[in-house]
Every structure is written in C-alpha cells, then in structure tokens.
Amino acid sequence: MTVGIYEQQDFTGGLNLRADQFQLAENESPKMLNVDVDPRGGVFTRGGYTAINSTVIPSWNPHRLFRFDGDAPQIMLSNSTKVYRSTGSNFSTLQFSSGNDIAIGSSFGAGFAQWGKTLFISTGTSGNGGYKYESANTYASALTANGPTFQPYVSPTGGFMPCAKHLAVHANKMFAANTIENSVAFPNRVRWSHDSLPEDYMTDDYLDVEGGGNGITGLVVVSGQLIIFKPRAIFVLFGYNSASFQIVELSNRLGINTPRSVAQSDVGMYFFSYPEGFHYYDGSSIKNIFNQLQPIMDLNYLDITTKPVDVSWVNSRVWFAVPYSVTGTAATKATVNFVYDPSINAAGTYTMFQSSDSYGLLGGINWENSSGVSFGLMCHANIGRVVSVDNYEEQQDNLTGTASNFTTYYRTKWFDAGSYIQKKMFRRPDFVLKEPDAATTITVDVYHNFDEADGNQRRTFNLTLTPDPTAMAWGTGVWGTGVWGAGAASAVVVTGSNLGLARCVQLQFSGELGKKWGINSIGYKFQSRRVKG
C-alpha cells in the first residue's frame, strides 16, 4: 500500500481563533501560547521577561511608560496618581519641590510630550498648568494654567500651559486637548501654542471638536497629521498654522475610550475600538487587523468594563494587552498579550503571550540607556514591576527576583491529507526540531477526527532531545580566534510514534518547563484506506 507524505514547513500564519477549523490556512494555529513565530517558517519559545526594578512601585495602577531622551535617557512612568522616573533600574517619584510629588488628576494618567531636551507633563487637574522637566534637574518646574490668562503673539512671556489631559508636539507647536480653563471644562477642545514657543498660548488658538461623543480621548501624530480621537470618532487636523488648520473626519464609527488604547509605530498607529477590534492607520486609510481574533469579541471573552485594552509598540511588534477569559468569569486585569507582527505575511501574524504568573504586560516603550543598549520595556499588569521583554537568552521569567517557569505550547490545524472522508493510518511522523542547548522533552498530544477538546487526546508521546556534544554551539564554540554569537546552531530530525487510524489528526506540542524548544517542520506519513459506500 502506497505511503503518502506531507511536509509542513511554514508556520507563519500564526494564531487564528476563528471557530470554523476549515477556514484555517495550512500555516495557522488555533491554539498557541508563549511561542514566537519565525519569519522563515518555524516556531520557538518566546524570550523571557526580566524585571528592571528590584523595589516594587507602590499603589500599582500603571497607565503608560514614556521614553524621555533628555540630557540623560530616562524612563517616565504614569501611575494613576503620580509620575515616576528611572534611569534603568528602580523608580522614584518626580517632585516639583522637596517632599511634593506631582499629583495626577486625570483618569487617563499624565500626558507627556518632549520638546527639545524638556519634558512637558499635563496632569488634568483644574487650575494646574502642568510641569516641565529636564533630566539634569532634581525637580520639575510648575507652569501656570492658561485661562483666564493668555499670551498675545506680540508679547509672549513663557511659563504657561493649558490645564489638559493630552499633549502632543506637532507642526512646531505644543497641542493640548481636553482642557479646563478658568475652572470650566472644555472636554472637546484642542489648543495650540505659539510657533516655536510651547509655553505661550493665544486666546483664540483653539478648535472645538464636537462630533463622536463627549471628550477627546487621545492625540497621536502620524505622517505629519495630528490625529484626534473621540469615543466614537476619529478626526485629522490638517494645516500648519492658525490660519490653515482644519478638521477632517476620518471615521464616524471607530474611536477609543482611553489614550492607552492607541500606540504610535514607526510608520503609523495601532488602536483598539470597541467592539470593532484592532485597527491600523498609515496616514491614508484605516485597516482592520482583527479578523484572526474576531471570536474573542463574539464570544464575550473580553470584558473592557473593568480594564481597557492597552496597545503598545515594542520591538517592532504590537502588544495588545487584554482582560481575556474563557471561563465565564470576567478578568479584572490584563491576562494575556496578543502580539501582532506586521512584517510577517500580508495580513500580519498573531501569537499569544502570558507571563509566568498569568498576566499580560502593558504601557510599553522602546528605550535606550546611556550606553546605547536597547530594551523593550513594559509594565506588569498586577505587580509594581517594569520588565524588559524578548530576552531570548533567558528560558524563564524573572519578575520578582526569582526565576519562574512559563507554559509553552503550539497546536496544529487539522490535517486530513486532502480528504476527511477517507480514513488513513497515520504512521510515525518525522519532526525537524531546533537543537536545544540543554536536554529537553517535548510532549506531543494527538487528537482525532475534529475532537479537539482538552483531555480528549487519543495518544501521547514524548520527543527527547539532547544537545550534540560534538556540534559547534553558538556562544560556546570557538573557531580559530573568533568566538561565535548566541543561539542554537542547527536542527535535528526526530521520529515520533504512530498517530493512529483516523480521518484527520491534530497535534499539540508542549515544551518542558524552563527549557527552550522549537519546531522547523512536521513530516506526516499516511496510508489511505478504501472508502466504503
């Protein structure tokens, strides 16, 4: 009897949660956790998370991190009530005088905008004009709130800024939105400073954006455009001065509820609109990128009434932190990250990450320390730690000073060799696996005939891998006088056990805790049985 073979070498479709398994592409997965997608085709264990601060930040309710490139690089953090700063390790509160912390009065947290080597901070507190801060200074300097006092063009004085909830630098001006002027709230107002003078504002230099619900919820600059978010609309400010500024509606359906739900990338912005999902804007059009994850909304796996969906752009990928739960009990904090890589495939690729203590990460930035070393930094959703991500040399998370293991698995789509009608005897498959740097075991669960419920696997076997002592391993091998870099140098072929008689099969690979692993290819072997009428 002829033995058929099929080799799967492409896994770049990533995670796709659509309920109908027949819609999955050959390179997509219905279930994966803490594995990264290799652009060249394989999957492998994600990098570890490592906390940068040994001292826990108190009263933890993080909003966002901000990269401040002043005289010395600093990490700024907006909590629910205070502003913190760090040079790469522990955090301290930012004060405006000895013993006086900057207080935040906005539910959105602090607004940050860098102008030259100066950081401007809005607090959203009535009567407070915000602060300016330089990294060389011990304290921030208070600014006087605009309204009732404004500065004519002919006599700028400096030292002023509107009381606002959002800040952005655009067209050589400082923009402030959702303002409070002389104790009167103007939630739909956008003000801008004099040209080149971020501390002076003219009385009539503002626009009120009334459509899309009450209150401006975010400002982002994309491709020379100032994007103004409302709860149910998105607007674009075109022009370059008070005489030419005009508002154009980009969408009257999409919007955000908090600035945490939008992140600026290198060439555009990503945002979450409820209930429409994740979207991307490149300066010309809005693209829906939520198709692969639509069931999480349809099945009510997200509860954003307790926590917003947080969006970060870290290490050239989008990290969507969501309160995700499939148990029927609403999650009160971000439990996972759906990580989207726009560089893989035309539609981009998703995977799902979760920390070793079962939480997501949020408020992320790309940051570079004074030595020029780059880090992807994010806030832990539950404990007062800021962590670096994508540490591929680490096999565990270190969130509290002690390393801890995280769960990893990857499940294939159903494989039916072209026909689910015909039964097949699935023989021993071959696997091309990434060679480990330490002995490890991968557990393979085999499911039959579209019965994919957890615990219903028909067979289970192990793939045992040991590093080749004669092979040149990255980081340890020396060739002549040159020492090689980091990472596994090769792959190994391992044969599994029979998969059994079935119409179709599905495999789930689960890695050993605390060990790296990866798959480059799956080679199926099968013998088709005669079809009975």
Residue ranges and their predicted role:
Residues 65, 128-131, 136-143, 167, ...:
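Generic beta-strand hydrophobic packing signal
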Residues 82-88, 130-145, 181-200, 237, ...:
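Short beta-strand segments and strand-loop junctions that repeat across beta-rich extracellular domains
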Residues 82, 127-129, 233, 277:
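A conserved positional marker within WD40/Gbeta-like beta-propeller blades
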Residues 116-120, 124, 129-131, 161-162, ...:
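A short, charged
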Residues 107-153:
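Hydrophobic or amphipathic alpha-helical targeting/insertion segments
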Residues 48-62, 92-106, 143-308, 351-354:
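Beta-propeller and closely related beta-pinwheel folds
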Residues 126, 181-182, 514:
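Short, solvent-exposed loop/turn segments at secondary-structure junctions
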Residues 1-120, 253-269, 273-533:
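Beta-sheet repeat architectures centered on beta-propellers
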